[in-house]
Amino acid sequence: MASTVRPSFSLGNETLKVPLALFALNRQRLCERLRKNGAVQAASAVVLQGGEEMQRYCTDTSIIFRQESFFHWAFGVVESGCYGVIDVDTGKSTLFVPRLPDSYATWMGKIHSKEYFKEKYAVDDVQYTDEIASVLTSRNPSVLLTLRGVNTDSGSVCREASFEGISKFNVNNTILHPEIVECRVFKTDMELEVLRYTNRISSEAHREVMKAVKVGMKEYEMESLFQHYCYSRGGMRHTSYTCICCSGENAAVLHYGHAGAPNDRTIKDGDICLFDMGGEYYCFASDITCSFPANGKFTEDQKAIYEAVLRSCRTVMSTMKPGVWWPDMHRLADRIHLEELARIGLLSGSVDAMLQVHLGAVFMPHGLGHFLGLDVHDVGGYPEGVERIDEPGLRSLRTARHLEPGMVLTVEPGIYFIDHLLDQALADPAQACFFNQEVLQRFRNFGGVRIEEDVVVTDSGMELLTCVPRTVEEIEACMAGCDKASVPFSGQK
C-alpha cells in the first residue's frame, strides 16, 4: 500500500513542517505564467541550476552551504550540485542529483538512491547530473529556458544553468527571469505560513535580547543570544543577513556589524540600542529591527525620537492597501519625521518647504522598505516599466511598485543623526535654515532609531507578521522582566 504521508521539511522538535507541496505549487504557477507568454514555444523546458559547495579561499574548509534562491523556490532542495528541469506543457519535474563516489560514504555519510530523492522532494523523476544532456535529448524539448537577469538590489547577474552538451540545444535566456521573478513577488498561503514562522521565532529572540541586555555587555553578546535562540528554538542555522547590533553612536551606522565594525562596542549607560536581526528557516527570511534604551528606561530625548519613528511606522502600515504607491509611503514617513523633529524644536519652518529640499533624507537616507521572501532583499522591486526615482532617499528605495495582495514587505522608517549628512546639510543654505543648531547639538552623539516590521499586503490592507514590544511602555515592561504579550497592531486607523 502506498504511503499517505505527505513529504515535508522539518528539523524536528517544535520546528515548522513545511510541505513540499509548496514547491510543486510554485512550479505549477511558473508553468501557468509561461504558457500565457506568447514567446514561449510548445514543448519548452525550464532548466535551473542549484548552488554549489564553496571553500574558504584556497583551502579545503567548506563554507556552510545555503541553496540558491531561485532553485530553492522551485524545488526546495537543500543539497548542493543539483539541477532541475520542468516541462512547461505538462508541469512534470525532474531533479538531477550528483552521482557520488564511494568515498562519499566514508567521509560524508550514506549515499542515497534516486528513489530517496524522488520521495523526499515529491518530484516526478530523479536522474543523475551526468545524464542531463542525454535525458533532455531523449525528451527533445523545443527550447531550454534558462535563467539570466540582473538583481536590481545588487546589480549582479544571476547564474545561468550550464552543463556539458548544452550547446546542442536551442536555449533562450531572456524569457524565464522576469516570469519567475514575478512569481516570487507574490507569496502563496503556504509561503506565508513559513514567513509567519520566521517572524514568530525571530520576534521571540528579539524579546529575549531585550530582557537580557545590560550595561557593560558587548554588542556581540546580544548577537550571540539572538542566534542561539533562533537555532535552538527555531532550527535556524542561518540568519537572513549579518546581524546589526548597534549601541550609542553606532546606531547611526546603517549597516554596522561588518568585519571592520563587528558588533564589538561595550554597551554604556544612556545608550540607545538598535538591533536589526532576522532568522532564516529553510531559506525563508525575516528582517526585524528593535530600538530600545540600554538601561531599560527611555530618556525624554530618546522617547521623543522613538515615538516619532513609531508614529511614522504605524501611519504607513495603516495606509497600506492594494493600489498604494510605495514611494508615497516613503514620502509620508519623511513628512511625519520632519513634523516630529519640528515639534521637539530641532527644526523650524514649513514642513512642505523642508520636503522640497529633501531634508527628510538627511535623517532617513535609506528606503522605507523592501520585498521579503527567500532573500532578505527579495527580487522583483524594479521590473520592466518601473523606474527608480532619482531623488535623495527615494533613490535608495528597493521598489517603486504599487502594492498588490500577496506582496511581503518590510516597513522600516528611521531617524538617524549621521554627522556626515548633518554637516552636509548645515553647509547647504537651502537646508541649514531649518535647523536649530543648539537643539541639534544635543543629538549629535545620539545614534539613531529604526523600527522594522514585516508585513503582507492583503485585499483590504495589511497583516503584520512581526510581534515584538513596540510602544515605550511595552518595551520598558519587557526589559523589566514583565513577559506579557505585546498588543498586536492591527493597522486600523
From Swiss-Prot:
Catalytic activity: Xaa-L-Pro dipeptide + H2O = an L-alpha-amino acid + L-proline
Metal-binding recorded as keyword: yes
Organism this protein belongs to: Mus musculus (Mouse)
GO molecular function: manganese ion binding; metalloaminopeptidase activity; peptidase activity; proline dipeptidase activity
Keyword field: Acetylation, Collagen degradation, Dipeptidase, Hydrolase, Manganese, Metal-binding, Metalloprotease, Phosphoprotein, Protease
Domain of life: Eukaryota
Binding site for Mn(2+) 2: D287, H370, E412, E452
Membrane-crossing residue ranges in chain numbering: none
One annotated GO biological process: negative regulation of programmed cell death
Gene: Pepd
UniProt: Mn(2+) 1 binding residues: D276, D287, E452
Family, as annotated: Belongs to the peptidase M24B family. Eukaryotic-type prolidase subfamily.
Protein function: Dipeptidase that catalyzes the hydrolysis of dipeptides with a prolyl (Xaa-Pro) or hydroxyprolyl residue in the C-terminal position. The preferred dipeptide substrate is Gly-Pro, but other Xaa-Pro dipeptides, such as Ala-Pro, Met-Pro, Phe-Pro, Val-Pro and Leu-Pro, can be cleaved. Plays an important role in collagen metabolism because the high level of iminoacids in collagen.
InterPro entries: Aminopep_P_N, Creatin/AminoP/Spt16_N, Creatinase/aminopeptidase-like, Pept_M24, Peptidase_M24B_aminopep-P_CS, X-Pro_dipept-like
Positions contributing to a dipeptide binding: H255, D287, H377, R398
Subunit structure: Homodimer.
Protein name as annotated: Xaa-Pro dipeptidase
Enzyme kind, highest EC tier: hydrolase
Modified residues (N-acetylalanine): A2
Cofactor: Mn(2+)
Residues that bear Phosphoserine: S167
